[in-house]
Each structure stands twice: as C-alpha cells, then as structure tokens.
Amino acid sequence: MSINDKPIGFFDSGVGGISVLKEAFKLLPKEDFLYYGDSKNAPYGTKKVEEVKALTFNATDFLMNKGIKALVVACNTATSVTINDLRENYDIPIIGIEPALKPAVELNKGGKIIIMATPMTLAEKKFANLMDLYKETEDIEPLPCPGLPELIEQGIVSGDVIYNYLKDKFSKYDNEKISSIVLGCTHYPFIEETLKEVTHNKACIIDGSFGTSRELKRQLKNSNMLREENRVGKVTIFNSREDKDIIDLSYKLFNMK
C-alpha cells in the first residue's frame, strides 16, 4: 500500500475528538480515518501529567500499528502535555489542537472572552504561553469545567443536566458583556446548542476543529500524502472500553447534525 492510501489516525481521551473528526472528513472526503477513543481512562483533564503522557503514547502505538500516515491528537489536554514528545518519537505528521484564542481575539469587539477547558489544559505552560500573547490587551477569563466531559461520555449532550451545569458555570457573567466563548475541549462542541440557550445567543462560540482540520490537509498536501483516488473515504472507530454502547454513541455523535 502506498503512503497516500494509508488511513489518518485520530485520538482523543474519549468521544470528544469526534467533533474534530467530523470537520476533517468534510475537508478530506476521500481519506480513510481510524479513530481511537480512550473512554476507559476518560477524562484526562484531571489526571497527572505523566499518566496522560503514558496513555497518549499507548493510543498512538495502537494507531501506528494500524499503519496510519498521520496523527491528529484531537484532545486539548493530551496536546498541551504530550505533543512535543510525540513529534520527537514518531516520524509522521502529528497535528494537535489548542484553544482557538487567536480567532476569538480577531473577532472581539471589546467584550470578555471566556475559555472553557479542563483544569489540566488551563494549568499547562502551553496555555499560559497562549494567554501571554493577549492578556495585556484583551479581557480573557479561563473557565475550568470539571465533570463536563464525563457527562458527554455518557451521551448526555442536552437536557436539564447539561443546561443546569452550564447555567451554574455562567451565572457569574453578564451575557451582554461576553464577546466570545472558546471551546477548549473537543467534547464541548456537542453541547453548543445548550450553551447558546444559556447565554441567550449573545456570544460567538469558537472551537479549534476547523483550524486543526485545515492544518492536517495543509501538511498532507505539502508532503504529497493526500489520497488521489476519486472515492468516498470511510471512518472506523475503536474505543478502549470495548463495548457496543460507546461505539454506537461514537457513530451517533459523528452523524449528529
């Protein structure tokens, strides 16, 4: 098999990275994708750094053994902790994801920018460096959201539980003064509709899925690794939990409009 015909690997701590996979499949419809969700060990956002590194390398080895030509680390926490180590150890294009703060700043008209993310993403040096670029000129507030990925892992993406969780998190803010909300975890796009409801559609909601997918395409094109055959690609999903319910949920989220 030529390198062009090999699949693209996607990895996340659970089902969240499927939000990025959806964007990538739209942008690269001829490609085959292998997705590995580590729901057995989710969430990563409250774990120790060394544990996240070990789990990320395990997932990467799983996908490398399947013959992938590129890897997308579709997990903000794993990206912030492990991306440099991965690039040093594997000789394929490796694309990470980080909170889409730059587009939020570019769209900002003087309001508050809120970054929703896991506690670990917000605590990492990579995030601090990102904040340093803009903190002098922008009103940016990190909002840790522990427990939210766990709800989404259970398939709870709407309804009273999600609404009340978000209502509580945003109760301290004046919706009129929020310019943008950056979704700094790949699980969060699945609760975007409820988030709009809670914030009365006042804020622009931004996630990094499109930017990450565009970077994936750019790197594959520059390396002459894009699939050329005129065909419709396929998506195959694996999960460390190895039960039918989590695989069914994964495909359901992938097909969710």
Swiss-Prot record:
Family matches, as Pfam families: Asp_Glu_race
Listed PANTHER family: GLUTAMATE RACEMASE
Name of the gene: murI
Gene3D superfamilies: 3.40.50.1860
Keyword terms: Cell shape, Cell wall biogenesis/degradation, Isomerase, Peptidoglycan synthesis
Binding site for substrate: D12, S13, Y44, G45, N76, T77, T186, H187
Taxonomic lineage: Bacteria, Bacillati, Bacillota, Clostridia, Eubacteriales
Annotated protein name in UniProt: Glutamate racemase
Any single biological process term in GO: peptidoglycan biosynthetic process
